[in-house]
Amino acid sequence: MAHVKRGVIARARHKKVLKQAKGYYGARSRTYRTARQAIIKAGQYSYRDRRQRKRYFRKLWITRINAAVRENQISYSKFMYGLKKASIAVDRKMLSELAIFDNVSFCSLIKSSKDALTSIELNKNL
């Protein structure tokens, strides 16, 4: 049986893993075995956190909108319901940006939301 030498392949694989682990602390960047484990774990974290980031940003936008609408004596849920009834389709990210940077237009959205809510209440009373 022929003698198989695979030093080149193993070295290339180790080099690739150690290159990915560059910047890690201690043995995690120097030894192949721990570097490989660290890279696998880092991949799991990044996969999870790409999904969590979407949740965190949505939570942040809702918090900002809630704080802005409560200054105008309306709750977040009523504000969003009023926008839906007024047929205004603006996503939470844009509402958050408007609340921070363009308060005048955000107040007009609050007003139209309140108007839609009062028209719903008037229809219920009839």
UniProtKB/Swiss-Prot annotation:
Question: Member of which family?
Answer: Belongs to the bacterial ribosomal protein bL20 family.
Give me the Gene Ontology terms describing cellular component.
ribonucleoprotein complex; ribosome
Q: Which UniProt keywords apply?
A: Ribonucleoprotein, Ribosomal protein, RNA-binding, rRNA-binding
HAMAP family membership:
Ribosomal_bL20 (MF_00382)
- The answer to whether UniProt assigns keyword Ribosomal protein to this entry is yes
Name under which the protein is recorded: Large ribosomal subunit protein bL20
Keyword Ribosomal protein present in the record's keywords: the answer is: yes
GO MF annotations, alphabetized: rRNA binding; structural constituent of ribosome
Q: Which residue pairs form cystines in this protein?
A: none
Q: What is the lineage of its organism?
A: Bacteria, Pseudomonadati, Pseudomonadota, Gammaproteobacteria, Enterobacterales
- What GO biological process terms are annotated to this protein in UniProt? ribosomal large subunit assembly; translation
Q: Which SUPFAM superfamilies match?
A: Ribosomal protein L20
Q: What does this protein do?
A: Binds directly to 23S ribosomal RNA and is necessary for the in vitro assembly process of the 50S ribosomal subunit. It is not involved in the protein synthesizing functions of that subunit.
